[in-house]
């Protein structure tokens, strides 16, 4: 599995590259993880409802093709896009989502942060119920794209402009609250290592 460090990128260009890559790719030999930070943007998934957009100010809202509702991306957030052949791995989407959540929980445990998944609302949550990681995927031709966003050290205030993932009143957390000297690159690297070991 090839790991690509993309640095800071605008959302739309990476989304278009994911779509192009998934259209043209082959089987497991083409599996990749893309690690990126995005400039501020709201993305509204296919199930997204306008009522969950409260006050987005000057930040753009983009309608996209992943599952789920609205979320926010900004600098200081570790975004990971697993571009994988689920078909070649003989794994269903539900097990794949669980694998992504389990990897993120293991990552947080490495930083001594207790976290859990919820059966009723995909993502990863810290002990007090706040959400620290959001996820959403699209599967095309048996291959996944889109991914997971882990709040590391960012301005969380734009989340107040939406009901994150369609959950009214959902409060957000970030890793820097628990680990002050944390950075996105470290989280990207550790997540990729943990996931690669699980995917083999």
From Swiss-Prot:
Pathway: Protein modification; protein lipoylation via endogenous pathway; protein N(6)-(lipoyl)lysine from octanoyl-[acyl-carrier-protein]: step 1/2
Enzyme class of the recorded protein, top EC level: transferase
Pfam families for this protein: LplA-B_cat
Residues holding substrate: 66-73, 134-136, 147-149
Any one GO molecular-function label of the UniProt entry: lipoyl(octanoyl) transferase activity
Active site: 165
Reactions this protein catalyses: octanoyl-[ACP] + L-lysyl-[protein] = N(6)-octanoyl-L-lysyl-[protein] + holo-[ACP] + H(+)
Domain of life (superkingdom): Bacteria
One annotated GO biological process: protein modification process
Domain BPL/LPL catalytic: 27-200
Annotated TM spans: none
The EC number(s) this enzyme carries: 2.3.1.181
Keywords: Acyltransferase, Cytoplasm, Transferase
Keyword DNA repair annotated: no
Cellular compartment(s): Cytoplasm
Cytoplasm recorded as keyword: yes
Record-marked site positions (Lowers pKa of active site Cys): 131
GO cellular component: cytoplasm
Other comments on record: In the reaction, the free carboxyl group of octanoic acid is attached via an amide linkage to the epsilon-amino group of a specific lysine residue of lipoyl domains of lipoate-dependent enzymes.
Family per record: Belongs to the LipB family.
Described function: Catalyzes the transfer of endogenously produced octanoic acid from octanoyl-acyl-carrier-protein onto the lipoyl domains of lipoate-dependent enzymes. Lipoyl-ACP can also act as a substrate although octanoyl-ACP is likely to be the physiological substrate.
Protein name from the UniProt record: Octanoyltransferase
Organism: Dichelobacter nodosus (strain VCS1703A)
Gene assigned in the entry: lipB
